[in-house]
């Protein structure tokens, strides 16, 4: 079967470039082409010659002048022999195309709906793979860093939401002219399309803006210094803008749907009151976190100190939450969770924001080096002036003799300066170097640091003071073998020790009252007291120890102990001597000795009581060991023997008074006859 076709061409199309100059070679073409002034017709058996015999490409040219579409005619008829194998396929395709064309003729919105759906499908599943393949082919890259690349972020954050938004708008535009049979369905259709338009618009632009804010915040955090205090402010601003974008998007979406946001805000006011009453702590923490992010008293990785409800908190800020508590990593690496509102009502010290660290200390020099203190202070000032890490201009640098400590009379030197660093470890190193230099200055001048003082005093009786030469006194350089006493400072003696000493001091006073009632006991006790004081001094000179018991206790023993037989024997031997003297002279001497011994006994007794109290107090504060401990019977015997050797007049005077009282009746009896 042969198909015959005709080709009609308009003369104005200009098949030849130049009709006046034609080569004879084109005679065959002229024989096949019949050109006339009217529409040209070409009758060619295509089965025999084909299109290769017609060379139109070299001769077709655009018209010089514009030709209306009505005058342009192009008709092509062709015929060819076809096989029987492809006839069923051609018929099937023809039927499908015919039916689809008829369906599209019945529903015109399908022309617009198909491209919109294709755009949505391409945006969801075709855009990202297409961009990845184009990146790999054009830029010669692999898929390893695809999700971290800028192309991926641009496609997913900006291009894809916009394409989805356009696809949703095209779908709504295609479905808008659809006519539904009922009025209710029309209203539902309109509201549904309006909802899709509003939702797609709000979501697309809100997502793009929020992605832009997040990318900007991420870029700033990567390029800025992590220790910069402005990071926290930018983070707060980014979070605030991010929240504001979505709040505005929700409000706009409600307005587009036809809801009044003013009514919702009014209802939200009542809800805010209820939320405030129910979750006051949560809302307070949120507002406090907003204040912390806005005012920035501290940021992440800063060292702060505060006191919350009596608990000292010191550590590094690890997390500042919006609703959750702030986490501080303590010095012992423990996590401390503190509600945000606690920081708004308590004092917070930010140690990281220090511009300088201060060195402030005192050095106490001994009072024995008072003549060197001027040179020491001057050299210490030179040490601080020569140190390059010490601030010399803006802040003070002080080295002064500030005070004399009254407890030990130490000379206190104030050292105060500032180190030019904000790092604590560097400050500690500079402080160590400065203190070592100051101690070298003290040792260079051969001065001594002050220590606690103990006062050592020598004990004397009245007779010892009169008989001791000035060279052996406390002002001389000669060491004296006399009893010593250690006295601690007053602040080391507590009230309990004082009460005990007062109770012990009350016993000798009671015994003194008993002595006052018995005049003979006074007379006998006075020489014994002197002897006991001398006996108490004798062991100290041998052992150079402080005899605490031998100073205070012999007073009681000498009064209460009766005279021994040896004393009576000595007094008996002296009776004849007393008889030889006159009665008047004996009585006057006895009165003088009684008055002198009683006054001496009172003074020595009072001194011994005071010394005993002091020694008891020092014994409780100082670990004084006694090398010689004698039993009470042996001490009594030693006291009596010491009294005999010292030649005391106490027992002799008492014996003389007894002899005088016996001799007076005898003399009276002898004179009466």
UniProtKB/Swiss-Prot annotation:
* Native source organism of the sequence: Arabidopsis thaliana (Mouse-ear cress)
Compositional bias, Polar residues, is annotated for: 661-673
Protein's name in the database? Mechanosensitive ion channel protein 2, chloroplastic
Q: Which residues carry this modification: Phosphoserine?
A: 571
Describe, from its UniProt entry, the tissues in which this protein is expressed. Answer: Widely expressed.
Q: What is its main location?
A: plastid
Null phenotype?
A: Msl2 and msl3 double mutant shows abnormalities in the size and shape of plastids with enlarged chloroplasts containing multiple FtsZ rings.
User: What family does the Swiss-Prot or TrEMBL record give for this protein?
Assistant: Belongs to the MscS (TC 1.A.23) family.
Against Gene3D superfamilies, the record matches this protein to: 1.10.287.1260, 2.30.30.60
A matching Pfam family: MSL2_3
Could you tell me what this protein does? Mechanosensitive channel that opens in response to stretch forces in the membrane lipid bilayer. Controls plastid size, shape, and perhaps division during normal plant development by altering ion flux in response to changes in membrane tension. Acts as a component of the chloroplast division machinery.
């Amino acid at each position: 079967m042969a198909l015959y076709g005709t080709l009609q061409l308009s003369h104005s199309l200009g098949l030849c470039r130049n009709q006046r100059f034609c080569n004879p070679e084109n005679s065959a073409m002229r024989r096949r082409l019949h050109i006339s002034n009217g529409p040209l017709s070409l009758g060619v058996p295509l089965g025999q010659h084909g299109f290769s015999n017609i060379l139109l490409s070299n001769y077709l040219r655009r018209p010089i002048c514009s030709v209306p579409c009505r005058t342009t005619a192009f008709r092509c008829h062709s015929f060819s022999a076809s096989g029987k194998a492809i006839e069923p396929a051609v018929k099937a395709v023809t039927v499908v195309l015919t039916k689809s064309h008829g369906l599209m003729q019945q529903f015109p919105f399908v022309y617009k709906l198909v491209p919109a759906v294709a755009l949505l499908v391409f945006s969801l599943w075709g855009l990202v793979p297409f961009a990845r393949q184009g990146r790999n082919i054009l830029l010669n890259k692999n898929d390893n860093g695809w999700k971290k690349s800028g192309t991926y972020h641009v496609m997913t954050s900006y291009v894809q939401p916009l394409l989805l938004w356009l696809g949703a708008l095209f779908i709504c535009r295609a479905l808008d002219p659809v006519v539904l049979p009922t009025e209710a369905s029309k209203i539902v259709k309109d509201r549904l399309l309006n909802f899709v338009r509003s939702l797609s618009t709000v979501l697309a632009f809100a997502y793009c803006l929020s992605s832009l804010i997040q990318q900007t915040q991420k870029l700033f955090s990567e390029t800025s210094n992590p220790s910069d205090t402005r990071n926290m402010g930018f983070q707060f601003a980014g979070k605030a803008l991010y929240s504001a974008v979505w709040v505005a998007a929700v409000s706009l979406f409600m307005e587009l749907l036809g809801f009044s946001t003013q009514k919702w805000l009014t209802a939200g006011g009542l809800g805010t009151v209820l939320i405030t009453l129910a979750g006051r702590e949560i809302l307070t923490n949120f507002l406090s976190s907003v204040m912390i992010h806005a005012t920035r008293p501290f940021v992440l990785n800063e060292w702060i100190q505060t006191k919350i409800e009596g608990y000292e908190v010191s550590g590094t800020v690890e997390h500042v939450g919006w609703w959750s508590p702030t986490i501080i990593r303590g010095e012992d690496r423990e996590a401390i969770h503190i509600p945000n509102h606690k920081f708004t009502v308590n004092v917070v010290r930010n140690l990281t924001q220090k511009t300088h660290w201060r060195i402030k200390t005192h050095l106490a020099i001994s009072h024995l080096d008072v003549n060197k203190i001027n040179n020491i202070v001057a050299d210490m000032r030179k040490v601080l002036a020569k140190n390059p890490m010490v601030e010399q201009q803006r802040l003070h640098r002080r080295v002064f003799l500030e005070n004399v400590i009254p407890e030990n009379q130490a000379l206190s030197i104030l050292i105060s300066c500032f180190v030019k660093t904000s790092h604590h470890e560097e400050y500690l190193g500079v402080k160590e170097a400065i203190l070592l230099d100051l101690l070298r200055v003290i040792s260079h001048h051969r001065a001594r640091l002050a220590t606690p003082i103990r006062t050592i005093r020598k004990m004397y009786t009245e007779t010892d003071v009169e008989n001791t030469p000035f060279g052996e006194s406390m002002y001389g350089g000669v060491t004296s073998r006399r009893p010593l006493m250690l006295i601690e400072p007053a602040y080391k003696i507590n009230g309990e020790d004082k009460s005990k000493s007062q109770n012990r001091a009350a016993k000798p006073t009671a015994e003194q009252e008993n002595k006052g009632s018995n005049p003979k006991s006074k007379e006998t006790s006075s020489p014994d007291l002197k002897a006991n004081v001398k006996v108490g001094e004798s062991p100290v000179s041998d052992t150079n120890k402080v005899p605490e018991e031998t100073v205070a206790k012999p007073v009681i023993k000498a009064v209460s102990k009766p005279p021994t037989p040896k004393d009576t024997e000595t007094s008996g031997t002296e009776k004849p001597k007393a008889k030889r003297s006159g009665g008047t002279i004996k009585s006057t001497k006895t009165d003088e000795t009684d008055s002198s011994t009683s006054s001496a006994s009172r003074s020595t007794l009072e001194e011994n009581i005071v010394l005993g109290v002091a020694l008891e107090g020092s014994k409780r504060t100082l670990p004084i060991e006694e090398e010689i401990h004698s039993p009470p019977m042996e001490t009594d015997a030693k006291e009596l023997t010491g009294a005999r050797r010292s030649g005391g007049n106490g027992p002799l005077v008492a014996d003389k008074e007894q002899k005088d009282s016996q001799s007076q009746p005898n003399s009276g009896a002898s004179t009466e006859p």
